[in-house]
C-alpha cells in the first residue's frame, strides 16, 4: 500500500475523537470520514476542538464547510450520520480502514457491516468476543493480511500485556493477579443512577472508589497464549478523569531480585518495546502521564518484592491517549502487511 493510509471513524466519542487527533497529527495516515448519527457537524467541531483532559486542538484551524464536511486547515473530512454501519458509504471517501469506536458493534458479524459500505478492514477499539485481538508490541506481528476484522483489545490489556510479556520471557510467570486503579469513563454515572447489570457501577463516579470487573488480565492469555489461565484481575474505578495504573502481582518460575526485574524492563523499554513500554524512576503521579502515547510506563519506585519469587509491579497508562495511539499504530502495521 502506497501513500497515506485513509481511515474512517465510526463513533465520535472519547476514543473516536482522540484517534482523530492522533491521525491528524501524523503524516502516514489520513482521516477522510467520520460517522456519528447523534452529533451535528458544528457540535462535532466543538467537541473535537475543546477537550477537558487533553486541551484545545491547535494544530489546524477547524471549521464547518457544510453539514457534511469538516475542514481541518484545508483538509476536508466527510461527515456521515448513519445509524446502521452497512449504510455508511466508506467507499465514496476512499476509507480503507475503519475504526469502530461506538462500543456497540464489537463482534465480527456486527463489525463486518462496514465492509458492505466499502471499507477494506475494521479495527474495533474495544475487546471483542470473537474477533482476533492484537496488542502492538506483543502479538501484532501475528496479523495476516486475510484477516479483515480485528480488535485492539482494551486500554488495560495494552498496559498489562507488554509488562507481562517481558516478565514471562525473562523469568517465567507461574500465576498472577492484576488490579487496575482506573480513571472514570463515560459509562459511569455523575450521580447515583440506575444500573441494573452493575449495581455498584451506578453509584456516583466523582464521589466513590468503585470495585468493578475487568476482563483485561484474562485477555492477556489471548494475545500471549503462554499465559492463558495464569492471570486474572479486577478494577477499582476512581474519581479521576484520565490516566490509570496497573498493579501486577506475580509468582515467578525463576528466582529474581527486584533489581534484576527492573534491569530487564529497562532494557526492553530501550530496545524492542521502545515507544510501547516505558520506564521511570521519577517520583511520578497520575497527571504526569496525561498525553503519554506509550501503552505502559513501568514505575520502578512503586513496585515491591516479597521475595525472589513473588513481586508486585506497577505500570501507568493514559487510558485514552496511549490506547488511541496504538489503534493508529495497528492500522499502519496492518497496511504494511497487505
From Swiss-Prot:
GO biological process: glucose metabolic process; glycolytic process
Record: active site: 155 (nucleophile)
Listed PROSITE patterns: GAPDH
One annotated GO molecular function: glyceraldehyde-3-phosphate dehydrogenase (NAD+) (phosphorylating) activity
Keywords (A to Z) from UniProt: Cytoplasm, Glycolysis, NAD, Oxidoreductase
Catalytic activity reported: D-glyceraldehyde 3-phosphate + phosphate + NAD(+) = (2R)-3-phospho-glyceroyl phosphate + NADH + H(+)
Subcellular location: Cytoplasm
Sites annotated Activates thiol group during catalysis: 182
GO cellular component: cytosol
Pathway participation: Carbohydrate degradation; glycolysis; pyruvate from D-glyceraldehyde 3-phosphate: step 1/5
UniProt-annotated binding residues for NAD(+): 14-15, 36, 83, 319
Top-level lineage group: Eukaryota
One Pfam family it belongs to: Gp_dh_N
Binding sites annotated in the UniProt record for D-glyceraldehyde 3-phosphate: 154-156, 185, 214-215, 237
Summary of subunit composition and partner proteins: Homotetramer.
Protein name: Glyceraldehyde-3-phosphate dehydrogenase, cytosolic
Gene symbol of the encoding locus: GAPC
Amino acid at each position: 500500500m502506497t501513500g497515506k493510509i485513509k481511515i474512517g471513524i465510526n463513533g465520535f466519542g472519547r476514543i473516536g475523537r482522540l484517534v482523530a487527533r492522533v491521525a491528524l497529527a501524523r503524516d502516514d495516515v489520513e482521516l477522510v470520514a467520520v460517522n456519528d448519527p447523534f452529533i451535528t457537524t458544528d457540535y462535532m467541531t466543538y467537541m473535537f476542538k475543546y477537550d477537558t483532559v487533553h486541551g484545545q486542538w491547535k494544530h489546524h484551524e477547524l471549521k464547518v464547510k457544510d453539514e457534511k464536511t469538516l475542514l481541518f486547515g484545508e483538509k476536508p473530512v466527510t461527515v456521515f450520520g448513519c445509524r446502521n454501519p452497512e449504510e455508511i458509504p466508506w467507499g465514496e471517501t476512499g476509507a480503507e480502514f475503519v475504526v469502530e469506536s461506538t462500543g456497540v458493534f464489537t463482534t465480527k458479524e456486527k463489525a463486518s457491516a462496514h465492509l458492505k459500505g466499502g471499507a477494506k478492514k475494521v479495527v474495533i477499539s474495544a475487546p471483542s468476543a470473537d474477533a482476533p485481538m492484537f496488542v502492538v508490541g506483543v502479538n501484532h506481528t501475528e496479523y495476516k493480511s486475510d484477516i479483515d476484522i480485528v480488535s485492539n483489545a482494551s486500554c488495560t490489556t495494552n498496559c498489562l500485556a507488554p509488562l507481562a510479556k517481558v516478565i514471562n520471557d525473562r523469568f517465567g510467570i507461574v500465576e498472577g493477579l492484576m488490579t487496575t486503579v482506573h480513571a472514570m469513563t463515560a459509562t459511569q454515572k455523575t450521580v447515583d443512577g440506575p444500573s441494573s447489570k452493575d449495581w455498584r457501577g451506578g453509584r456516583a463516579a466523582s464521589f466513590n472508589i468503585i470495585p468493578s470487573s475487568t476482563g483485561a488480565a484474562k485477555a492477556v492469555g489471548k494475545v500471549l497464549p503462554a499465559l492463558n489461565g495464569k492471570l486474572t484481575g479486577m478494577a477499582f474505578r476512581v474519581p479521576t478523569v484520565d490516566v490509570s495504573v496497573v498493579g501486577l502481582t506475580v509468582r515467578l518460575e525463576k528466582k529474581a531480585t527486584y533489581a534484576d526485574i527492573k534491569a530487564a524492563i529497562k532494557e526492553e523499554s530501550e530496545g524492542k518495546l521502545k515507544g510501547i513500554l516505558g520506564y521511570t524512576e521519577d517520583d511520578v503521579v497520575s497527571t504526569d502521564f496525561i498525553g503519554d502515547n506509550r501503552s505502559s510506563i513501568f514505575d520502578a519506585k512503586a513496585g515491591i518484592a516479597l521475595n525472589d519469587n513473588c513481586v508486585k509491579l506497577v505500570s501507568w497508562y493514559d487510558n485514552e491517549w496511549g490506547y488511541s495511539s496504538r489503534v493508529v499504530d495497528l492500522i499502519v502495521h496492518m497496511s504494511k502487511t497487505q
